[in-house]
């Protein structure tokens, strides 16, 4: 997963705000107590994020459990990865209304039905830039489409990350 929000990183390393870390630790502890376990397994990541972190189904759709695998295992969640991904999803979840409103505006301007399952392609982004009457360099448009590997589209989750990168999301955790 790409580095989403530079404000949450110091010296190239991710720093989880203390209140958020406390919330994530409490959720993990409660899960372990409720399930008589010391580990969170990959197969339980999505249900855990839904029940214990209260992450919206719209965001859970984009959660990739394999991003959590502890090196040397095939089914145990790496706790540091949990803190990073959990923090990211909590921030996106608390900003979900703003993300949805902006996504809807973008899709409406393209004449498309608003849906979190829609994708924007390179021509879509070019059309948006033209409709905004912007002289957006092609490299900027291409950068928006290369968030992960060779993927040539922007989905709802990528769009949320872009909003975070440009400072449009509330990064405070209460």
Can you annotate each of these PLM segments?
Residues 1-37, 42-46, 59-64, 77-112:
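EF-hand Ca2+-binding helix-loop-helix modules
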Residues 3, 171-174:
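A positional/structural detector of protein chain ends, strongest at the extreme C-terminus
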Residues 32-35, 69-70, 107-108, 145-149:
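Acidic, divalent-cation-chelating loop motifs in proteins
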Residues 39-56, 77-90, 119-135, 155-170:
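Amphipathic regulatory helices of Ca2+-sensor modules
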Residues 48-74:
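N-terminal leader/targeting helix
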Residues 53, 108-112, 151, 155:
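Eukaryote-specific, cytoplasm-facing alpha-helical/coiled-coil scaffolding segments in long proteins
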Residues 57-61, 94-95, 137-138, 171-172:
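Intrinsically disordered, low-complexity regions enriched in proline, serine, glycine
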Residues 105-148:
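Strongly charged, low-complexity linkers/loops
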């Amino acid at each position: 997963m790409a580095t989403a929000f530079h404000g949450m990183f110091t010296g190239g390393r991710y720093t989880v705000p203390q209140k958020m870390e406390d919330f994530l630790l409490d959720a993990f502890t409660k899960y372990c107590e409720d399930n008589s376990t010391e580990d969170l397994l990959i197969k339980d990541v999505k249900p855990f994020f839904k029940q214990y972190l209260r992450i919206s189904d719209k965001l859970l759709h984009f959660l990739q459990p394999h991003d959590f695998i502890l090196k040397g295992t095939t089914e145990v969640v790496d706790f540091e990865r949990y803190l990073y991904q959990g923090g990211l999803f909590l921030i996106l979840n608390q900003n979900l209304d703003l993300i949805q409103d902006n996504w809807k505006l973008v899709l409406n301007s393209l004449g498309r039905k608003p849906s979190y399952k829609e994708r924007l392609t390179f021509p879509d982004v070019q059309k948006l830039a033209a409709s905004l009457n912007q002289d957006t360099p092609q490299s900027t448009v291409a950068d928006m489409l290369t968030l992960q590997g060779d993927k040539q589209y922007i989905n709802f989750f990528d769009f949320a990350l872009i909003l975070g990168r440009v400072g449009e999301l509330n990064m405070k955790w209460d």
